Amino acid sequence: MFVKKGDKVRVIAGKDKGTEAVVLKALPKVNKVVVEGVAIIKKHQKPSAENPQGAIVEKEAPIHASNVQVLDKNGVAGRVGYKVVDGKKVRYNKKSGEVLD
């Protein structure tokens, strides 16, 4: 999976298209990511001992990894490639050529 936790990404599809934010969680088994402030859903919680009223909680839902592009340090969005530098496999931005890791 080309996106990692902590990466700054731009959403390229969906209702939050154009938003730039940080990846909070990567879910490689389902190829999805949770991005800060993107795809907000409302979750209804039942009343419990600690919260007798119940609540409606807003949280981020996972979006497909193909709907985001990783930004490099200069803010250039591009596809991610892999190459070997000094015997280590690193990710790089194919558009700018800048190493991401």
Curated annotation (Swiss-Prot):
It comes from Streptococcus thermophilus (strain ATCC BAA-491 / LMD-9). GO terms for biological process: translation. SMART domains: KOW. It comes from the Bacteria. NCBIfam families: rplX_bact. The keyword Zinc does not apply. Keywords: Ribonucleoprotein, Ribosomal protein, RNA-binding, rRNA-binding. InterPro entries: KOW (IPR005824), Rib_uL2_dom2 (IPR014722), Ribosomal_uL24 (IPR003256), Ribosomal_uL24_CS (IPR005825), Ribosomal_uL24_KOW (IPR041988), Translation_prot_SH3-like_sf (IPR008991). One of two assembly initiator proteins, it binds directly to the 5'-end of the 23S rRNA, where it nucleates assembly of the 50S subunit. The keyword Ribosomal protein applies. Belongs to the universal ribosomal protein uL24 family. Transmembrane segments: none annotated. One of its GO terms (cellular component) is ribonucleoprotein complex. One of its GO terms (molecular function) is rRNA binding. This is Large ribosomal subunit protein uL24. Part of the 50S ribosomal subunit.
